[in-house]
């Protein structure tokens, strides 16, 4: 028994020693594991910090604390020329200028532009929140200028699936055809009366008439019509307000970068935007309100235009998907988006061709070859009018409607072209710089439509490689490039087919100079026309 007790005691002692050793081993293992994990985490943090330190902002001026380069911006108007001069001085294709706390990133390189709008499109899918955009969008209820979020996604889906899909484009063909004929009739009346033709006035109002017809079913806001088919006083007021608002949209207003100054209106931008928006509302809202009432009361049941589509869309429960507060600013936004780009391209194209008669001759020869002189050019002819479209591509390239594309805001920190782009940065793709980049375009300042011709394929007005910008691309790109192509091409083709153009007496050349404050031709193009088709082909004003 003593032997058993002794053996038992030895066994207990051995077991305790084994457990003690196991516990020590487990503790040591856990300590080692924790230590290794901490080392790995520390290494990761250090590596990330090192990488962040390696990535710098794009080159640019240092600026003042807090306010950045705002003081210089205020005395450097127009701001777009100042920003391009900075890039030229630094010899860079991407730059960073801090305005307040906002990093403004400017880009003139197609490769970098593709990195932003193609490779990292989703990351740069937002818009800035500014005073002007808040006014125009009724508190960010629209599609084009509303920051990224649920409201943007809702409105973008409506526009893309209900308004500008291929089926809707075909459905509204007749309305566009009516405005093409109205353009020809209006210009015919001016030419027949020996009146000079202001191309800026005509091209803008053609585009305005077309979008009003598509949106509201009418080309005019007046009860009366002008005798020669031109716009009424109401239509002129609306167009002027629209271009006023366009000129102050994303226009480097001081309060956009120093929000504490909002309401002081130090440079007058806020009042201009309020007044312009109110004028457009004055013409749009009564039509919208009356149409909503007609649908609500059952007096209208057939969809005839974009406004009807907006009103008639239902949600999953059968209720109206959109409120009046969403419909009104979205219509205003879409109406504003239509006239400036096509009209500017056609005015510049005509000005360039007057100074280069050989290009004008080739364009008219193509129209005569494709269409002939026994009928008017139609949208169905557009695929074959490659030289005409090459002229328009060259106008978009060399003479963009604006110096910069609408801003793309970074939703998080990003890396572009090897540079650190902080969250909230505004990336501005330079329409001006992309189209005139000498690394991309040979002899970039010369107007040469032939550079866009490709014998193997049809010429299109879109530019997917972002070597220039006609209609912007990506999640925030142009929603209706097909409509833009139709309006721009038909506008130029009808003006060329129906009339022979020359400068007024005692003028031999057009001075191809940009305005001091924007990218439009400094002086509106005015010419004198002669009929070049059989008289019976010209439509009458209806």
Swiss-Prot record:
Taxonomic superkingdom: Eukaryota
Topology in the lipid bilayer: Single-pass membrane protein
Biological process annotations from GO: secondary metabolite biosynthetic process
Enzyme Commission numbers on file: 1.14.-.-
A GO MF label: monooxygenase activity
The keyword Iron is assigned to this record: yes
GO cellular component: membrane
Main location: membrane
PANTHER family: CYTOCHROME P450 98A9, OS09G0441700 PROTEIN
Protein name according to UniProt: Cytochrome P450 79B1
Protein's gene: CYP79B1
